[in-house]
Regions:
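Glycine-biased, small-residue-rich flexible motifs in mid-sequence functional cores and linkers
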Residues: 2-18, 76, 81-294
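Short, small/acidic-rich helices and loops at N termini and domain boundaries
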Residues: 1-84
Length: 294
């Protein structure tokens, strides 16, 4: 990884030190994404290393690197809020992520026309077919397809983008060293080596706490995925789907939110009409997407 970057208002910074400091902050009791965001909002000109003991930061950095090495990861990168190479779009999030890990080609995160394709893990046969048709059209029109590497719609979106010769980004809810679901191990490796995998999840916190608490990182990544893209397209989702967290985030962040027409025809759910009233765009044909993203 690159060991230095430039802080917008300060001298060059040590990325490994900042990574360790950030990880150390996350190991404090009761730390949450919201509390981390509030901490840096109240210290806008400070780096993670300004807020912790430096010996603790170095120790945490060593632990992360050792953990990654044990998982076969050597060439990873980070992006730190406040540096020139941090994605400006992520600052639109209600609680901007202070540090991101990534594997692969970061240039994809800056490519034009990034669109998230998301939906249920228990996708129907019709929903799977709609996902494939949608992604093929997006790739045909030179969009970069972003999704969360979950089962169902996400997996199909990534696979179809690759098969169609397009670009894809996975924004995952685990550290870059972990795979969830396990069935996607090969797909995650392929995206990491040929495209881009992004994670906001603190490595040591995830390693040291139980799955019950680690599940809370998944909805947070949906907010980041929305901020990183110019639009979110929902293929299929239930009334309680985590996809709706991303739907709300998209509207809050000033992003376009598209909902496929088939969702409005499903009498078992009411969320499509609710979000249409809030500003979401109903998609009856692919041109509805193109017209609104010109």
């Amino acid at each position: 990884m690159s060991t230095t970057s430039t802080f917008l208002t300060r001298k060059p910074v040590d990325n490994l030190l900042e990574m360790g400091a950030y990880e150390h902050l996350w190991q404090q009791p009761s730390t949450t994404t919201k509390r981390i965001a509030e901490l840096f909002e109240s210290h806008p000109d400070q780096l993670p290393s300004d807020l912790v003991d430096l010996s603790a930061a170095h120790e945490s950095a060593r632990e992360v690197i050792e953990h990654f090495a044990g998982r076969g990861i050597k060439n990873f990168g980070i992006r730190l809020n406040g540096t020139a190479d941090y994605p400006g779009r992520l600052r639109d999030a209600k609680e901007p992520i202070e540090l991101l890990y990534f594997l692969g080609s970061w240039e994809l995160a800056e490519a034009p026309r990034r669109v998230a394709v998301v939906g249920t893990r228990q996708v129907s046969a019709e929903g799977a077919a709609r996902t494939r048709r949608l992604v093929k059209e997006l790739i045909k029109h030179d969009f970069t397809v972003v999704s969360g590497l979950a089962q169902g719609v996400d997996t199909i979106a990534h696979q179809t983008a690759i098969e169609a010769g397009g670009r894809t980004i996975a924004v995952i809810g685990t550290p870059i060293s972990e795979v969830y679901p396990k069935e996607n191990a090969s797909l995650q490796r392929q995206i990491a080596s040929q495209y881009l995998v992004v994670s906001q999840v603190p490595v040591l916190r995830y390693k040291n706490q139980t799955p019950k608490w680690n599940r809370l990182f998944f909805p947070e990544r949906n907010k980041t995925m929305s901020a990183l893209t110019e639009a979110t397209i929902i293929v299929e989702a239930s009334e309680t789907s985590g996809t709706l967290i991303q739907a709300k985030a998209a509207l809050d962040q000033g992003r376009k939110l598209f909902i496929l027409e088939s969702n409005f025809s499903n009498t078992a759910i009411t969320w499509p009409a609710k979000y249409e009233k809030l500003g979401a765009i109903r998609v009856r044909e692919f041109d509805d997407i193109l017209r609104n993203l010109e």
